[in-house]
Amino acid sequence: MKTITLDPGERLAAGQLPRQGVLPAAIMQSAQAIVDDVRERGDVALREYCKKFDGVDVDDFRVDPKLMDEAIQAVDPAFIEALKKAAAQIREFHEREVEQSWFTSRADGTILGVKVTPISAAGVYVPGGRAQYPSTVLMDCIPAKVAGVKRVVMVTPPQKEGGISPYTLAAAKVAGVDEIYAVGGAQAIAALAYGTDSIPKTAKIVGPGNAFVAAAKKIVSGDAGIDMVAGPSEVCVLADATADATVVAADLMAQAEHDPLATCYLVTCDAAFAEKVQGRFAELLAASPRAEITSASLADQGVVVVAADLEAAIDAVNVIAPEHLELHCDNAMGLLGKIENAGAIFVGPWSSEPLGDYVAGPNHTLPTGGTAAFSNPLSVQDFITRSSVICYTPEGLMNDAPATQTMAQAEGLWAHALSAGLRRKMVEEGLEGFDGVDLGDINRIAWPVDLAAPKKAE
């Protein structure tokens, strides 16, 4: 791991961090070509890409729903128990996020409010092929169902024999997925965004994927909603000498084993503790079945920040704005209020980050690459729309029309003022409409009073 030592009064700079930055132009170009092709040729293009990238000939992308039931019977009952426990706790957490439509009224009878509506269909991308991520199925599909989305569609790359992992299928059953399609990559994102003969389009697309999936999501984001353009996973551990070095090392490795590009930060005021943590890696890596990936991540993307004091350490955490933050330090809960930027915060020595990955309840789809400074975890809010509701009475109109016309005149928007002025005239003169009515001076209906020009400074 690279070590950055901050002198007293020195701040960590964002430029010192191993950010992956923007998606490479070559990947964006490749993804754009795939998206355009699927948009134009639909299922024909999808089949060609499935053969090219997954090595599978696909006749029907739609996965038979009965395979979900068969998967429930095929996997170890202990896995089903774990799935159901995780699903229950994820559902319970996200039910607290549910918004209701609300309305309020003024004394003049005007009604104002917000109408909350679930989106029509949500597309969920679940990585597959050689890997299997049933936790992603739960985390991305359950909030959509809690929000009231009637059509939750899952896409995932087929395995070499053309099927889907039984773990993924079992999770889809538990999560309440409505449709599953065996297709992955940028081509799956294009299908969800624009629709094909086999795969009807969805209003929003969520879920993690490789760089091509991320690029495709970015490309289609003007035509379908997306949750985020996610980069490699990351963890930041803020620790002091009260933490256990072996546990902290394991927590860093838990992120590093995802991907050679996964980023691990250890922030501390104790250089000796940082060395102690790094000294634990060799023993733990010797037992790890993913040692090669983990070692590469720690060596190339791992960073130790040694700060002069706790204030500087917390400032460094906020500059990093990590996807996952662990507070392994004395009075961890007392520090919570000082943390400004983090996707998920794991407080205290017992709050293992993998608990949040799988079963705690809060969502594990989190902003990466410093975007936690302005972005949020996936939630029920990602699967709803909010519409403002405005309903005026004649009395309410008369109260607000004059100010509306004045504002419109200041902006030079004559028809805006006329729209309010015509209604005002109807109320003032008891008219039901303007058929056969002489409007007279239309300009005075729009702008009853001329605004004085702004005074010039003397």
Q: Where on the chain are the PLM-derived regions?
A:
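Flexible, glycine/charged-enriched surface loops at secondary-structure junctions
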Residues: 99-104, 225, 262-267, 287-298, ...
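Conserved small-residue-rich beta-alpha loop and adjacent elements
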Residues: 104-170
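C-terminal core of ALDH-fold dehydrogenases
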Residues: 318-455
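N-terminal Rossmann-like NAD(P)+-binding subdomain of aldehyde/semialdehyde dehydrogenases
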Residues: 1-120
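Short acidic-hydrophobic, aromatic-tinged amphipathic segments that line or gate anion-handling sites
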Residues: 3-8, 179-184, 304-309
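A conserved active-site cap/scaffold subdomain adjacent to cofactor or substrate pockets
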Residues: 228-300, 304
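Conserved NAD(P)+-binding/catalytic subdomain of aldehyde/semialdehyde dehydrogenases
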Residues: 174-247, 251-254, 258-263
